[in-house]
Every structure is written in C-alpha cells, then in structure tokens.
C-alpha cells in the first residue's frame, strides 16, 4: 500500500488504518519538496501524482494507492483512476456523518482554498445546505501550523484564533466541524480549546478503512518505508515523531 501526501497529514490516515489492520506494511511518500499541495495548481498536482506513482512502482510492488490529501484527491483522482489499473483511493471531506451528528444544524467545514473551490465540494455543499447551515473557512496556513506542532516547534494560539475568528464571533457556533484536510487531525485539541465547548470532529480517516479493506489481501511489501522527495532539516526534525510508525527505512526518491 502506498500513501501519498506533501506532509505529515496523511499520517493521520495511516493511524486509522493501523488501528484496524495493525500488521499491514506500507510505503509513505512524504512529498515535502512540493509542500503544501493546497497551494499548487491543478495541472501540477495531477502530473506530480502520476510521476510519484510511476517512480515508486518501478521499485516496489505497490497494489493500492491512497491519495491522503483532500486537495490532491478532489483534483487528481479522476485522472489517476483512468491512468492506473491498481485501486486509487482518495480522501474527501465527509458530510453524511456530520449531518447525522449535528444537533443545531450548523456545520463547519475547514479546508484549503483549492479544496473549497473545487467543483466537487461546491456541489456537495449546495446539496447539504438545503436543510443545514454550512459555515466555511478556507485556509492554507493551518497545515503549516500542524507541521510545526508534530516537529515540537511553538505554534501561535493567536494565529489559530485569527483563522477561526469568523466562527468564534457567531452567536450560535458550529457544533460539528468537518476536517477537510488530513493535517487538521493533529490540531483537534487546539481547535477544541478555542471554542470552549464540545465539538464533534468529522475526520476523513474515520471512513477510509471501509474503502480499503477489500484490497489488503494483495499486500506484498515486507517492511514499512518512508520516502521523501527531499531529505532535509525538516525531515530530520520528524525522525522522533515517525518512530511510532516503525519505518524500517527513510530515503529520498528522485522525481526529476
């Protein structure tokens, strides 16, 4: 199984997969050279995803790919499914669980600007906003804050409050928040503290397991591997955090 993201966000997806399937082996492609995907153009994301999959397929017997980034999934998934014969699974903002859980019918969606502006998300918001109020925050900065947190660097509570200010000032705030970026899962505690009230978080990682379960019998990779597009200081800062994922090897892969 190959998991692709530009940063550590996809590791939140991997956490959910490991809970259900603790003995699986995986390759995690941390495309840090192109971080963050949320700021990249559609053409770049499609071409980059194809390049990554082709490069890794030449080295390892991958049988399934998870695009563990909401932005890349909303943009590149249709093309990738046409290009490759192996299963390609994307991570998309999940609305149905939010509709079932919300008590006040006010749902928050926070995602990158590219995800919010995608046709898929616009159609989905229109569909579910007929009976619910959906409040939207488009931000690329929150992914950067999540990266800082896992590297044990200081993060600004003032910046977090500024990002969520449009919701904080509401007299009736969202009681359910859809996390539209895999990075945001690492900031649940900080987001919860900002609102001073219980929040239902809808995490894309909670639903990904059901999508991939039927493919695990094809597993052939014998150890866990982390590939990065550039081995640098930021990757070295992640080494301690990555220990729990039991990667046997961390190496740079040439995509040029």
UniProtKB/Swiss-Prot annotation:
Gene Ontology molecular function terms on file: glutamate racemase activity
Catalytic function, reaction form: L-glutamate = D-glutamate
Active-site residues, record numbering mapped to chain: 69, 181
Keywords noted in UniProt: Cell shape, Cell wall biogenesis/degradation, Isomerase, Peptidoglycan synthesis
Biological process (GO), any one: peptidoglycan biosynthetic process
Ion transport as UniProt keyword: no
Protein name: Glutamate racemase
Species, as recorded: Buchnera aphidicola subsp. Schizaphis graminum (strain Sg)
Gene that encodes it: murI
């Amino acid at each position: 199984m190959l998991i692709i993201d530009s940063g550590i966000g996809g590791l939140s997806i991997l956490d959910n997969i490991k809970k259900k399937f603790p003995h699986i082996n995986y390759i995690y492609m941390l495309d840090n050279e192109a971080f963050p995907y949320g700021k990249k153009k559609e053409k770049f994301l499609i071409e980059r995803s194809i390049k990554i999959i082709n490069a890794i397929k030449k080295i390892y017997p991958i049988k399934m790919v998870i695009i563990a980034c909401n932005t890349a999934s909303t943009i590149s998934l249709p093309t990738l499914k046409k290009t490759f014969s192996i299963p390609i699974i994307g991570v998309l903002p999940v609305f149905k669980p939010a509709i079932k859980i919300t008590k006040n019918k006010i749902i928050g969606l926070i995602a990158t600007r590219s995800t919010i502006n995608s046709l898929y998300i616009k159609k989905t918001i229109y569909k579910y906003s007929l009976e619910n109020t959906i409040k939207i925050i488009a931000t690329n900065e929150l992914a950067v804050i999540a990266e800082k947190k896992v590297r044990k660097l200081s993060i600004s509570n003032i910046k977090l409050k500024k990002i969520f200010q449009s919701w904080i000032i509401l007299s009736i705030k969202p009681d359910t928040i859809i996390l539209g970026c895999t990075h945001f899962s690492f900031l649940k505690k900080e987001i919860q503290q900002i609102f001073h009230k219980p929040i239902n978080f809808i995490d894309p990682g909670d639903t990904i397991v059901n999508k991939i379960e039927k493919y695990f019998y094809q597993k052939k990779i014998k150890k866990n591997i982390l590939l990065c597009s550039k081995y640098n200081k930021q990757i070295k800062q992640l080494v301690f955090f990555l220990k729990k994922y039991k990667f046997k090897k961390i190496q740079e892969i040439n995509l040029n």
